[in-house]
Amino acid sequence: MTLPLAKFDAAEPLTPAIRIRDLYKRFGQLTAVDGVSLDIAHGEFFMIVGPSGCGKTTLLRILAGLDSITSGSIEIETPNSQRPVNSMIFQGDSIFPWMTVWDNAAYGLRMRHVPAPTIKDVVGHYLARTGLTRFAKYYPHQLSGGMRQRVAIARAFANDPEILLMDEPFSALDAQNKLLLQEELLRIWEDHKKTVVFITHSVDEAVFLGDRIMVMTAQPGKVKAFVPVPLARPRNIMELQKSPQYGELIAHIWSSLRDEVHRARQQEEEMKS
């Protein structure tokens, strides 16, 4: 099966939702993020890959307003002042254990004092989209890890943010549940085209989900490459895996990433010695 494949050199998006220029983040003598500059377009599904400790999560926390920058600039366009700027989904459970599935999904809307009828409609819609309708009255301890991440996804989309930030949200799941949630996430995203910034260690996941992939170097974290993913949407993982372009993209990204992973491992060994 042959799919159209564009050149690997990606142009900057014309209408940025996020603009980062010469961003540095230091923790004492340690430089975590080193002069990163990039634009992310409205509605783009933007993936970040890099070795452990390269500053990926630090960058995402800065975008979420959870960390400050040392120098540089970030501009986030917010065309709708009634929406929250962002929602963040973390690696582990980030839902409230004392709340039901319904109350977790409704939390952001209630904090914004959205009218109750609207909350009912919106939460009902996203619980249905994530297959959680019949679990609305369950508590997190009654759910599997995959179902808890579905709740986090439902809550994030229900809150209707301008930007969705995702930090390896499926990394703790088994392969089958990970694939199911990837497909569910894409289906919901294709309906609403939120701007998504998604961190992953999986090159396969980056190619399956993303419009464009940023490869980061080992510490200090710099931009090594931007790789476009010109595969048609909607995507089906079974069909993609049959296409030579899919494998070519994975090989191209891994060739860029491999040396950085080795360098990160060497840095870890030096710190231990």
Listing of model-derived features with the role each one plays in the protein:
Residues 49-51:
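The feature captures the beta-strand-to-loop junction immediately N-terminal to the Walker
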Residues 64:
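Helix-to-loop junction immediately C-terminal to a conserved catalytic motif
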Residues 71-82:
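Conserved ABC transporter NBD signature motif
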Residues 99-106:
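Short coil-to-helix segment of the ABC ATPase nucleotide-binding domain corresponding to the Q-loop/switch region
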Residues 110, 117-135, 187:
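Conserved ABC ATPase "signature" region
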Residues 139-143, 147:
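Conserved ABC ATPase signature
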Residues 158-162:
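A short, proline-enriched helix->beta-strand linker immediately N-terminal to the Walker B motif
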